[in-house]
């Protein structure tokens, strides 16, 4: 219903970051929901939270994108995009101090990937100096529902590299693994996966929404996490992992949280941080705890695992503490890492892309919507560049090697 039922003043102190206050104390989320088919919107509207959204903020088409990136980006999506931008503009004009935009989308289908990246590039044109953070769900072969996912994902990454400021990389495979292994769920549903994603999103954004001892926002996060502009794809982890509707058995200590959040099993994307090195990382703790203990633990982590952090960026792990824990937990922690091991995911998608593209499989669905093969080639080479950039910085050391010295002589 959009009314606040708690009794904590701090919860309401910055409620206007994500909500507009309407008459009689109702809060309306500043969210725009878009899709190219009406079905999903109908299920949101008839669901438990359907009534809290502003009805005008549902923007949908009738035809669907049929898992086709070109339909989302060039044909169907292009027809709908202006009505979406009108709503976005209206919401942006209501803001006192607009910091940026958050886009949640998947990269495997047609709408989230094609139209999602179209929306991002349009917002980029209109608000060039605002932050653009995305929560992007990458496709994975183990949990696949369309054969053309690698095409859609590669074309999307090509856009995200250029137009997004920070991408939180999520992955259905990793989310399923967490449900199976850690939460011991036998048949996880999308509801369970979304529960994990929402816990992570809540953690990433808690500094924007609540007062805390060490405050950070989207821009500070970007400044601390992105050493090179193209390398803005982050792995996210969360601790403690709980399943929907479960009660937590005992409160974790700060050392346990620190241990868990960096564990590969707690990462929301299917890449193993131990196979690469962290360029930068950030940890956001929530709950009543001593900032001193958090700092000590973080230093401890860096000292014990120094080989997993690049040595040419000193102090590359930042931590922040927010006093208000998530609902149902005493303490929690969200971890965001800019790790070179994320290239495993890009490699995986790229290899599948190349296998199909070499034989030009399924290409007619895209060229039929007016795309050119050239675009596929460009997206593929951009993905290759991204992978080799991650590899280059993974191998980089603080000491200049002989090879560099020769370059200086010539210069």
From Swiss-Prot:
Residues bound to GTP: 37, 106, 110-112, 172, 194
Name by which UniProt lists this protein: Tubulin beta-2 chain
One Gene Ontology MF term: GTP binding
Record GO biological process: microtubule-based process
Its job: Tubulin is the major constituent of microtubules, a cylinder consisting of laterally associated linear protofilaments composed of alpha- and beta-tubulin heterodimers. Microtubules grow by the addition of GTP-tubulin dimers to the microtubule end, where a stabilizing cap forms. Below the cap, tubulin dimers are in GDP-bound state, owing to GTPase activity of alpha-tubulin.
Renumbered residue ranges of the record's region Disordered: 392-411
Cofactor: Mg(2+)
UniProt xrefs under InterPro entries: Beta_tubulin, Tub_FtsZ_C, Tubulin, Tubulin/FtsZ-like_C, Tubulin/FtsZ_2-layer-sand-dom, Tubulin/FtsZ_GTPase_sf, Tubulin_C, Tubulin_CS
Keyword Zinc: no
Alphabetized SUPFAM superfamilies for the sequence: Tubulin C-terminal domain-like, Tubulin nucleotide-binding domain-like
Family: Belongs to the tubulin family.
GO cellular component: cytoplasm; microtubule
Alphabetized PROSITE patterns for the sequence: TUBULIN (PS00227)
Source superkingdom: Eukaryota
Locations listed in the record: Cytoplasm, Cytoskeleton
Organism: Anemia phyllitidis
Keyword Metal-binding appears in the UniProt entry: yes
Keyword tags: Cytoplasm, Cytoskeleton, GTP-binding, Magnesium, Metal-binding, Microtubule, Nucleotide-binding
Positions contributing to Mg(2+) binding: 37
Record field: compositional bias (Acidic residues): 402-411
Disulfide bonds: none
């Amino acid at each position: 219903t959009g009314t606040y039922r708690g009794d904590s003043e701090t919860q309401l102190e910055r409620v206007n970051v994500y909500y507009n206050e309407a008459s009689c104390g109702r809060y309306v989320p500043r969210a725009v929901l878009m899709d190219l088919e009406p079905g999903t919107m109908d299920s949101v509207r008839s669901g438990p939270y359907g009534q809290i959204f502003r009805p005008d903020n549902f923007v949908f088409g009738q035809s669907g994108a049929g898992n086709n990136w070109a339909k989302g980006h060039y044909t169907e999506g292009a027809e709908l995009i202006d009505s979406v931008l009108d709503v976005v503009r209206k919401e942006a004009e209501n803001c006192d101090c607009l910091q940026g935009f958050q886009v949640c989308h998947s990269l495997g289908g047609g709408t989230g990937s094609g139209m999602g990246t179209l929306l991002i590039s349009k917002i980029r044109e209109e608000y060039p100096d605002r932050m653009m953070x995305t929560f992007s769900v990458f496709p994975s072969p183990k949990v696949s529902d369309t054969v053309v996912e690698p095409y859609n994902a590669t074309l999307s990454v090509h856009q995200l590299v250029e137009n997004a400021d920070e991408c939180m990389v999520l992955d259905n495979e990793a989310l399923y693994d967490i449900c199976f292994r850690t939460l011991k769920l036998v048949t996880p549903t999308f509801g369970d996966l979304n529960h994990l994603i929402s816990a992570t999103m809540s953690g990433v954004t808690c500094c924007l929404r609540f007062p805390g001892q060490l405050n950070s926002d989207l821009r500070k996060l970007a400044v601390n996490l992105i050493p090179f502009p193209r390398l803005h794809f982050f792995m996210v982890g969360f601790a403690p992992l709980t399943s929907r509707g479960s009660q937590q058995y005992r409160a974790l200590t700060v050392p346990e949280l620190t241990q868990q959040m960096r564990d590969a099993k707690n990462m929301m994307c299917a890449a193993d941080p131990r196979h690469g090195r962290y360029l930068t990382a950030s940890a956001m703790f929530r709950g009543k705890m001593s900032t001193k203990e958090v700092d000590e633990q973080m230093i401890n982590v860096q000292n014990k695992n120094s080989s997993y952090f690049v040595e040419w960026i000193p102090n590359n792990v930042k931590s922040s503490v927010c006093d208000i824990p998530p609902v149902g937990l005493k303490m929690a922690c969200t971890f965001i890492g800019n790790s070179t091991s994320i290239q495993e995911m890009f490699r995986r998608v790229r290899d599948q892309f190349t296998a199909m593209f070499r034989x030009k499989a399924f290409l007619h669905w895209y060229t039929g919507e007016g795309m050119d093969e050239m675009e596929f080639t460009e997206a593929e080479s951009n993905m290759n560049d991204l992978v080799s950039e991650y590899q280059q910085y993974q191998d980089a050391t603080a000491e200049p090697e002989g090879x560099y010295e020769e370059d200086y002589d010539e210069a």
